[in-house]
């Protein structure tokens, strides 16, 4: 046992002595020129190492350096600039003149992917004739890297003249194998426009076709987005992504993604081809797509609820907005297909939602924008031409949509319920609720079935006004607090916030009405004039009851939507009805009592 222990001690001493001798005899600065040459030959980038290289023996044999930078040819700024670098090397390969790096560690690095860091040629260079490549000169050293680690670093990303994006607190680990499969573990965060996104992911990169193509399989990704314009709890989720990046032509493809976002689930694929005109393709499926939770939209509350809407601060953008409207549409081509089993928007639940459309450099066509709300259905195809005026044109077809659900979406007071059907053509220059109610124009045929006017009983207003002025008739003792109209229809014209409804007619078992109305949507005011015939509820003198059932009473409703005033012209209506009745009876009496005209005499 003592001999074995002595042997082990001797081996350790020999090993330590050999390592010490190797480190002493091999100068790490001998690798400087070789590493610079290898990096430039393999990547085209230029490696710069400031200061002396030095050994670090414990706990891992490493080469330490000072400031490190990697630059593209002719670039104004380096792509990578790090405070220090550590190369963890293997001991035994050094004996055979092979520098095998187990890990590259960069700390405090700044990575710039900006126009200033891109390669630039000083002048057009002649193109050499094709031929066999010149073999690399023999060298006693070989250079391999198995792992790269980046800690506490920053990435500056910028495309063209777009604002730069700073990605901070980067912690990245990359491990490669012989088949050029790279395992990646990354965590980072970035802040933009008062919004903070933190994320972490684990992925496998297929580098077999690098640099022309890189494929990625992200097995897990988790994220959290917080800040202005978002719900108080933010947006968070997990998922998986599978895709690839192609260098020439530059194209990003996500073959499949599955992400959760709060209580929403997103599945689909997308691709982006970058060039003079960018081209995007998106296919999205979702079992539930809650836009209220994703976009921080407050649920609209009715005027009678007395509740406050949730106020969500909007972000203050850190860069100037483009003065050219729809610039993104002008410079791109896109195709979009979205299917959601359930979509939530401003508290409104839409089933079987479908969106299909395309953009051809500013000319947008939406062939399908449809869904179900309650028992109703809507389909709103349309077009958008950013070079024309009006910009947007839609052809809505609504069938039996619940009014009580739609009114809060447009921030209109409650008080109406029924099933809205509409068909028409509308156009405008902006896509927003405010623009729709203040700038849009168009016309439509409108019909509302099972209409209910809450807190207003038209039959009660008319009958009680008549009873106060005529003791020959009576009215019911009890009334409901609403008016039910079986069906109401009209022709509507919208003109910059002014809604004019003509040929307005409605009927129910208790009454019929005809008239027209004007609505000021921005001011939320209206002025409606109707002639109403009350067919039920009259009691008393039969002749008076018959007269009242056949008499149209003028009724005017006017004022703010939530505080309507009314004006009844009962006397005028009855007086006109009695005058017409007297004229009719006088005419009938005259015809009956007029002497017969004598026949003309005939000549013999």
Regions found by a protein language model. Name each.
Residues 68, 104, 109, 148-153, ...:
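Solvent-exposed loop/turn tips at the surfaces of repeat/solenoid architectures
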Residues 68-173, 274-331, 453-480:
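Secondary-structure transition motifs
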Residues 16-116, 387, 555:
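Terminal hydrophobic membrane-targeting helix
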Residues 101, 185-187, 191, 202-204, ...:
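Glycine-rich, small/hydroxylated-residue low-complexity segments
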Residues 45-48, 75-89, 161-172, 191-202, ...:
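Amphipathic hydrophobic-ligand
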Residues 2-12, 53, 247, 257-259, ...:
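Extended terminal
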Residues 127-223, 317-359:
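Elongated, acidic membrane-bridging lipid-handling scaffolds
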């Amino acid at each position: 046992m003592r001999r074995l222990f002595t042997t082990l001690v001797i081996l350790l001493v020999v090993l330590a002595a050999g390592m010490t001798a190797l480190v002493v005899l091999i100068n790490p600065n001998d690798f400087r020129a070789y590493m610079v040459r290898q990096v430039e030959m393999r990547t085209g980038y230029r490696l710069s190492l400031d200061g002396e290289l030095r050994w670090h023996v414990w706990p891992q044999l490493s080469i330490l350096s000072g400031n490190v930078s990697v630059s593209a040819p002719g670039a104004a700024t380096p792509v990578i600039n790090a405070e220090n670098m550590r190369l963890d090397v293997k001991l035994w390969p050094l004996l055979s003149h092979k520098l095998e790096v187990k890990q590259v560690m960069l700390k405090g690095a700044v990575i710039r992917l900006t126009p200033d860091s891109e390669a630039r040629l000083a002048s057009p260079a002649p193109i050499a004739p094709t031929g066999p490549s010149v073999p690399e000169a023999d060298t006693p050293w070989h250079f391999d890297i198995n792992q790269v680690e980046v800690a506490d670093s920053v990435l500056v990303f910028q495309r063209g003249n777009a604002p730069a994006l700073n990605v901070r607190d980067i912690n990245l680990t990359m491990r490669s194998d012989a088949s050029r499969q790279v395992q990646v573990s990354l965590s980072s965060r970035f802040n933009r426009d008062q919004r903070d996104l933190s994320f972490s992911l684990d992925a496998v990169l297929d580098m077999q076709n690098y640099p022309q193509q890189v494929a990625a399989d992200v097995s897990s990704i988790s994220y959290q987005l917080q800040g202005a314009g978002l719900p108080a709890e933010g947006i968070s989720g997990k998922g998986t992504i599978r895709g690839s990046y192609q260098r020439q032509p530059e194209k990003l493809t996500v073959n499949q993604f599955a992400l959760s976002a709060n209580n929403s689930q997103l599945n689909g694929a997308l691709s982006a081809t970058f060039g003079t005109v960018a081209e995007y393709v998106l296919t999205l499926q979702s079992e539930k797509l809650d836009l209220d939770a994703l976009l921080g939209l407050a649920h609209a509350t009715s005027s009678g609820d007395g509740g406050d809407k949730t106020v969500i601060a909007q972000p203050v953008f850190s860069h100037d907005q483009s003065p050219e409207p729809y610039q993104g549409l002008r410079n791109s081509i896109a195709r979009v297909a979205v299917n959601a089993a359930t979509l939530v928007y401003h508290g409104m639940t839409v089933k079987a939602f479908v969106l299909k459309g395309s953009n051809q450099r500013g000319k947008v066509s939406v062939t399908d924008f449809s869904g179900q709300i309650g028992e109703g259905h809507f389909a709103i195809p349309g077009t958008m031409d950013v070079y024309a005026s009006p910009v947007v044109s839609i052809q809505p077809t609504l069938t039996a949509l619940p009014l009580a659900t739609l009114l809060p979406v447009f921030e209109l007071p409650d008080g109406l319920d029924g099933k809205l059907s509409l068909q028409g053509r509308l156009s405008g220059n902006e896509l927003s609720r405010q623009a729709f109610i203040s700038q849009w124009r168009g016309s439509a045929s409108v019909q509302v079935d099972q209409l209910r006017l809450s807190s207003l009983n038209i039959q009660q207003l008319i009958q009680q006004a008549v009873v106060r002025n005529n003791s020959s008739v009576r009215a019911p003792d009890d009334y409901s607090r609403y008016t039910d109209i079986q069906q109401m229809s009209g022709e509507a014209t919208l003109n910059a916030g002014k809604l004019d409804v003509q040929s307005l007619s409605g009927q129910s078992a208790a009454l019929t009405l005809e008239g027209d109305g004007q609505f000021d949507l921005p001011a939320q005011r209206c002025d409606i004039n109707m002639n109403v015939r009350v067919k039920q509820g009259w009691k008393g003198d039969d002749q008076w009851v018959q007269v009242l059932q056949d008499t149209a009473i003028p009724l005017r409703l006017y004022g703010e939507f939530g505080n309507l005033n009314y004006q009844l012209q009962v006397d005028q209506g009855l007086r006109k009805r009695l005058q017409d009745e007297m004229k009719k009876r006088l005419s009938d009496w005259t015809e009956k009592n007029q002497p017969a005209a004598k026949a003309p005499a005939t000549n013999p």
